């Protein structure tokens, strides 16, 4: 019987180690939130050093620790590596390769966490659904969340953040999403880029950096949509779905009625399907997120009865 998460034998295989079997329940970088059975990665950063917390990790019930220097005073199983962050990335990439999970990667200048959290809420009754935690979307958090995803997960939803060009590419090489979603291109990160076009190019890494992708979902009304579409045409991605508030997309708003407190929407989906829902007047900004979610569920062939 396979373990619920990555197993010690699989870790031994990847890192040429010889540790005896122990139950692994996920992974952590922080002893304050570490759970019993978690792998502890002693990350050495500019302002803190995880190696100082090996004893705390042992007391909290960590299963094993990845370290750059062995703590001989601890009885915790330890694997010495050259760089613990690289080890985290390598282990997450390896574990991902063992899974049959459909992975959905979400990026955009705004709305990533809200969209992912809404998906989590809608599918809360579903078993075998995993959504990465809020803001765990960088080189530390995303691979950590892959290791926290149970082996039997059917659909995994992850957000990918960036501040510089090339960051999403590195995350995609680990995550290998089956479906990639770009919510929007805005000037949120303009401080590190010269133009919105540069942001669009950097965001496009979510679908140009992997051959695993079956489907791409784009907001047809976002900045530089034509650029993103042109990049899509140069890939081997089988399916593209777009959404907008207008009727020139795969998923669009067919009817819109506004009352004092609610915006009632009737949305058209491929196959002549219609779905109705409402959002509060003060949450009109969530409409694009809702359209993205509906498009994603269609691409996954998930029944819209769950909405």
Regions found by a protein language model. Name each.
Residues 60, 173-175, 298-301:
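Alpha-helix C-terminal capping segments
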Residues 46, 81-84, 135, 161, ...:
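Short beta->alpha junction loops/turns
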Residues 67-75, 181-305:
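Acidic, Mg2+-coordinating active-site environments of NTP-dependent enzymes
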């Amino acid at each position: 019987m396979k373990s619920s998460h990555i197993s010690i034998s699989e870790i031994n295989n990847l890192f040429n180690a010889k540790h005896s079997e122990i139950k692994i329940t996920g992974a952590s970088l922080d002893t304050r939130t570490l759970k019993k059975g978690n792998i502890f990665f002693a990350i050495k950063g500019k302002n803190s050093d995880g190696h100082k917390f090996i004893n705390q990790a042992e007391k909290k019930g960590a299963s094993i620790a990845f370290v750059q220097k062995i703590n001989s005073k601890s009885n915790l199983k330890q694997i010495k590596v050259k760089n613990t962050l690289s080890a985290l990335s390598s282990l997450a990439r390896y574990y991902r390769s063992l899974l049959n999970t459909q992975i959905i990667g979400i990026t955009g200048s705004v709305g990533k966490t809200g969209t992912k959290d809404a998906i989590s809420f809608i599918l809360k009754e579903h078993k075998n659904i995993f959504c990465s935690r809020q803001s765990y979307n960088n080189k530390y958090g995303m691979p950590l969340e892959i290791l926290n995803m149970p082996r039997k997960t059917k659909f995994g939803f992850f957000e990918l953040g960036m501040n510089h060009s090339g960051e999403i590419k590195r995350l995609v090489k680990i995550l290998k999403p089956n479906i990639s979603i770009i919510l929007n291109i805005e000037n949120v990160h303009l401080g590190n880029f010269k133009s919105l076009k540069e942001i669009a190019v950097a965001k496009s890494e979510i679908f140009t950096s992997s051959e695993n992708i079956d489907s791409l979902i784009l907001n047809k009304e976002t900045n530089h949509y034509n650029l993103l579409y042109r990049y899509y045409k140069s890939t081997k991605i089988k399916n593209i779905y777009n959404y907008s508030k207008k009727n020139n997309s795969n998923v669009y708003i067919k009817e819109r009625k506004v009352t004092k407190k609610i915006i009632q929407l009737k949305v058209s989906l491929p196959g002549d399907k219609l779905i109705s829902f409402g959002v509060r007047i003060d949450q009109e900004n969530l409409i694009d997120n809702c359209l993205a979610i509906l498009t994603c569920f269609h691409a996954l062939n998930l029944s819209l009865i769950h909405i």
